[in-house]
Amino acid sequence: TITPNGITRFMAIFQCNNPTEIGSIRSARNDFIPLAAGFKSIYVHWGGEREALQKLNNGIIDNVDAMKYEGTVFYRKKGVPVPHNGFTDINKILDQSQKLNYNLENTFTGYPHEEKELKKNISNLASEVVVDYLDPYGVRWTYDRQDNIYKRERDGNPEIDKNANEQVSAKIVAVIKTTSTYLNQDYITVKTQGGGEAIIYQGGISIPGKWKKDPAHLDSKLYFYDNNGKEIKFLPGNIWVEIVI
C-alpha cells in the first residue's frame, strides 16, 4: 500500500513457505487489516498508526505486536538502520500465537489454479509491467520467459531478496486500482474493500478485469475476475499484488 508522502509499504503473506528470518517488520496500517482478515492470517506488526492499533488492541483480528514482545519474540538486527531493523522468525511467531490461543489451522481456501497453457495473442502479450509509484519507488516487472516468472525492479535497480541473495520474482503480478481518503495530515487509508479495476499478469500475458472484496464482511476473500465475470485462474506459484491509487 501507499503512505501520504508516496512511500510504498509491503505486507508479506506466508502460507506454503516459512522463512527462518522475517523482516523488516514495520507498523500496522489501517489498509492492511481487511487484507490480513481475508487471508485468515495472524497479523504481525511493530506498533502502528493510531486507528489501526485501536482496532487491533480491541481484537478485530488475531495479531502479534512487536511493541509488546521486543527482546523475546522480536529483535533489533545489528547493522541495519532504524526503523528497518525489526526482525523475527516464523517459529517465534507460531509459539507466541499458540500462547495467545490463536487458531493456527489455515482455513484460507486459496485460488483456483490454471493447469492449461495460457492462450497468447498479439493483444495480450505482456513482457513488462510498469507501476508508476512516486520516485524513487517506481516499480518495473520484467517477464523471464525461461523461468516463466516476472522479476522486480525498484527505482531502476533489481529488487534483491537478502535471504536468498536473488532478484525478487513472482509467478503472478496483480495490479489493482483503488482510492484513498485522509485520516489526518499524517495518514491516509487506502480502500481495500469493495472493488475496482485490475490487471493480472502471468505467463507473459495480461488479463484485464476486476477485483472484489465484500465490504460488509471484514474477513471476506479478495477475488479477481476477468471482464466476463469469471474468476481468474492462476498459474501455481507466488502472487504479488500491487495496489495503486
Where are the predicted features?
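A surface/extracellular/periplasmic glyco- and lipid-processing/surface-interacting theme
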Residues: T1-I245
